[in-house]
A protein has these predicted regions:
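Short strand->helix junction
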Residues: 21-22, 104, 145
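Short, solvent-exposed amphipathic alpha-helical segments in soluble enzyme
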Residues: 2-9, 61, 112-115, 152-154
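ATP/NTP phosphate-donor binding region
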Residues: 1-43
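Carboxylate- and glycine-rich phosphate/diphosphate-binding segment that chelates Mg2+/Mn2+
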Residues: 112-199
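Glycine/threonine-rich beta-strand-loop-alpha-helix active-site module
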Residues: 27-140
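Hydrophobic packing residues within well-ordered alpha-helices of enzyme cores
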Residues: 3, 56-59, 186
């Protein structure tokens, strides 16, 4: 609502799609894409946690490239730089801004998105540098009023990502240092806000 109020104040036309649930579905993304095609935005602002940002990334892809085969984009591979399918270039129709309200997934600064096809039950992972948001606005004020349960879950998500990075086959001395420091930060500071006991 504060973002919409500011856009109104500036005289910027806008519309809002707020039907994204946790673990977003392809069907939900298609519904949001239909709204985009009707409104024709030149900027997409994704506000929320990882689910909202992932869904918005998928909507962005389908808005910019309606003819691309979704199953081709979601192929399995080990290295993001060694894809068989060439991911379509993004940003011709709309600029993408990510505004996180939780810090668990890091979707605002990663080239990944996950979406579930409700009809088949398949969870599609998409990974390509074209999915990187053009801008990320990370404002801690957006997170200070979050429920403790969400903050706990986000903190554990941060730790999980750090452990995955540390155990990755593609880990290096550089990434190990970042991963270990992320784990240390979770242990040092998560309990301060949540009163959660970490061993």
């Amino acid at each position: 609502k504060p973002v919409e109020d500011k856009l109104d104040e500036l005289g910027i036309q806008h519309t809002c799609f707020s039907e994204v649930a946790p673990d977003p579905t392809l069907q939900c993304a298609r519904k949001g894409t239909d709204m985009m095609r009707h409104f024709e935005p030149d900027t997409i602002i994704a506000i929320g946690g990882g689910s909202a940002m992932d869904a918005a990334k998928i909507m962005w892809v389908m808005y910019e490239h309606p003819d691309v085969d979704f199953s081709d984009m979601a192929m399995d591979f080990m290295d993001i730089r060694k894809r068989i399918f060439t991911f379509p270039h993004m940003g011709k129709k709309a600029y993408f801004i990510a505004v996180p309200t939780s810090s668990g997934t890091g979707s605002e600064v990663t080239p990944f998105a996950i979406i579930t096809d409700k009809t088949t039950g398949i969870k599609w992972p998409l990974a390509d540098y074209e999915l990187m948001p053009d801008m990320a606005i990370v404002d801690t004020d957006n997170m200070m009023s979050a429920p403790k349960g969400l903050t706990c879950a986000s903190g554990i998500d941060v730790m999980t990502h750090a452990l995955e990075a540390y155990a990755s086959m593609m880990a290096s001395d550089y990434t190990d240092g970042l991963a270990l420091n992320a784990i240390k930060l979770v242990f040092n500071y998560l309990h301060v806000h949540t009163k959660m006991v970490l061993m």
